[in-house]
Amino acid sequence: MIGLVGKKLGMTRIFFEEYTSIPVTAIEILDNIVVQVKTIENDNYESIQLTTGFKKEKKVLKSEYGHFLKFNVSVGRGLWEFKCKNSSNYSSGQKITINFFKNIKKLDITGISKGKGFAGTVKRWNFRMQDATHGNSLSHRVPGSIGQNQTPGHVFKGKKMSGHLGDQRTTIQNLKIVKIDDINKIILIKGSIPGSIGSDILLKPSIK
C-alpha cells in the first residue's frame, strides 16, 4: 500500500473546549515526487519509488544522481519505495500531496527509534529488580539464571539479555489523525511516534 514520507518536527499539545487536552506529534509532509514506477513486466513486482525535500548535488552519490537524472526528477533527500497493486496509475514526476490522507482516519507510522546505547535487562526488557536488602550484595539489577544444566548446555537463541537498545526500524499502528494543515503541510498525530526530531518518517493508511 502506498504511503508518504514526512519529517518529524516534535511534540505539542492540543486543547479542547471541554478543558481537556491530548499530546500530538507534528509531522511535516512536503510534496512527495514519484521517481520510478516499477511494474511486473520489468521488475517482477509492483511498487513506486518516492522522494521528497531537497539535497545539494555535491552531497549526492553519482549513481544516485544519475538515477534522478534518468527519470528527470530533481534531487531529493532520499529514496523510499512503497509496494502497491496499481503502480500503473502513477508516473515519474507526479506529485502526491498531504491531501492524500484527507479521508483517512488512522495511520501506521514507521521510523528509526532513538538509540539508547548498551542497556541492561531492567531497562531493555522491563525485568523486575531483585531484593534491595535481605542479604542481597551487588545483585540488584542482574537478570538471574540464563540457562538450565549440562543439557542443553547452551543459552537459547533469542534469550532476553543486556545489549544495544533502540536505533531500530519501528512501526506503531492505528495512530489517529487529529488535524491536517494543508497550507503549512503539517499533519498532527495523536500520541508519540518513533524517531528523533528531524528524522524521516513513513506514513501509511492503517491496515487494521
UniProtKB/Swiss-Prot annotation:
Example GO BP: translation
Key word Ribonucleoprotein present: yes
PROSITE patterns cross-referenced by the UniProt entry: RIBOSOMAL_L3
UniProt feature coiled coil, ranges: none
Subunit relationships: Part of the 50S ribosomal subunit. Forms a cluster with proteins L14 and L19.
Its biological purpose: One of the primary rRNA binding proteins, it binds directly near the 3'-end of the 23S rRNA, where it nucleates assembly of the 50S subunit.
Name of the protein: Large ribosomal subunit protein uL3
